[in-house]
Amino acid sequence: MLEQQRNPADALTVSVLNAQSQVTSKPLRDSVKQALRNYLAQLDGQDVNDLYELVLAEVEHPMLDMIMQYTRGNQTRAANMLGINRGTLRKKLKKYGMG
């Protein structure tokens, strides 16, 4: 499978209000990194064993919700857009009570 070339301008972004009350965009990964930094700081040295699932659920559920809205419930189209097979999509939708 060939990896698609991605234009940095097409990256997922988050709108942020800066100190000068201006709306700017920053990559989603920066927001995820900051959220993880905050979460880990709150742990105060404690270990956690489900961080991967926690983060995945925080991103995966809204992503599935939005893609299903975008495709108007067309699971085949949604699976193609996500780059997964339809069976996998159906399992994920069921996991989040969406299917």
Swiss-Prot record:
Please name the Pfam families in this protein's record.
Answer: HTH_8 (PF02954)
**Gene3D superfamilies from the UniProt entry:** Homeodomain-like (1.10.10.60)
Give the molecular function GO annotations: DNA-binding transcription factor activity; sequence-specific DNA binding
Q: Could you tell me the keywords of this UniProt record?
A: Activator, DNA-binding, Transcription, Transcription regulation
From the record, give the cysteines joined by S-S bonds: none
Q: Annotated DNA-binding ranges?
A: 75-94
Q: InterPro entries in the record, alphabetically?
A: Fis_DNA-bd (IPR005412), Homeodomain-like_sf (IPR009057), HTH_Fis (IPR002197), Trans_regulatory_Fis (IPR050207)
| PANTHER family found in the cross-reference section | DNA-BINDING PROTEIN FIS (PTHR47918:SF1)
What family does the Swiss-Prot or TrEMBL record give for this protein? Answer: Belongs to the transcriptional regulatory Fis family.
Q: How does it assemble?
A: Homodimer.
Say what the protein does.
Answer: Activates ribosomal RNA transcription. Plays a direct role in upstream activation of rRNA promoters.
Q: What is this protein called?
A: DNA-binding protein Fis
